[in-house]
Design a protein with these regions (language model features):
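Short, low-complexity N-terminal intrinsically disordered segments enriched in polar/charged residues
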Residues: 22-68, 161
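A solvent-exposed, acidic/Ser-Thr-rich amphipathic alpha-helical stretch
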Residues: 37-44, 59-119, 126, 136-142
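Bacterial N-terminal signal peptides that target proteins for export
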Residues: 1-10
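Bacterial N-terminal signal peptides
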Residues: 9-19
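Short beta-strand edge/turn micro-motifs at domain boundaries
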Residues: 142-167
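Beta-strand secondary-structure signal
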Residues: 122-128, 148
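Sequence/structural signature of outer-membrane beta-barrel proteins
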Residues: 130-134
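A short, structured loop/turn motif at beta-sheet edges
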Residues: 112-122, 151-158
Length: 167
């Protein structure tokens, strides 16, 4: 009888353990789905801000899109690193080309490949753009640009660019 009782106790504890594990996994799934939905909404907010800031070319607005330690590989020359240098680079570009105007900025989010892991997200896709260097210049539409963007979730739940590279 003692041996049977030990087996029943072990079976009961194993069943209880499995049940609690399954229950906690099932209970965590909605939390993970909620977090994923919140991340997607916050990333979409960054996308909209990116489009607005790029079209206006406001240096302060463009700077707000970046994490404090962001790296921009899109400027001519060496990479621009850090929020302070990012702001200076945008202001310098605006001063050098005061009539520069973005006529079209259209990242293709429908075909963009993306993944979110913890506080990081990566996006790889294409962007179409048209711009004018001055008011009298003809519009320039470079070929579709392939870019890679690394996003970093901020402590407030928002997302900012951590690294942007163009190919």
């Amino acid at each position: 009888m003692g041996r049977n009782m030990a087996l029943v106790t072990i079976a009961f504890l194993a069943g209880l353990s499995i049940g609690l594990t399954v229950r906690s996994t099932v209970a965590a799934a909605p939390e993970q789905q909620d977090m994923h939905a919140a991340n997607l909404a916050a990333i979409e907010k960054l996308h909209k801000a990116d489009e607005e800031c790029t079209l206006t070319q406001d240096p302060k607005c463009l700077t707000t899109l970046w994490s404090d330690d962001g790296i921009n590989l899109g400027f001519p020359g060496p990479p621009v690193v850090g929020i302070k240098d990012m702001g200076e680079a945008y202001a310098k570009f605006r001063a050098q080309y005061p009539e520069f105007q973005v006529l079209k900025y259209a990242p293709d989010y429908k075909t963009m490949q993306s993944a979110i892991v913890d506080e990081w997200a990566i996006e790889v896709g294409y962007t179409d753009a048209t711009f004018k260097m001055s008011a009298n210049a003809a519009p320039v539409s470079p070929p579709r640009t392939k870019d890679m963007r690394l996003l970093k979730r901020q402590s407030d739940g928002s997302w900012k660019f951590a690294l942007v590279g163009l190919k």
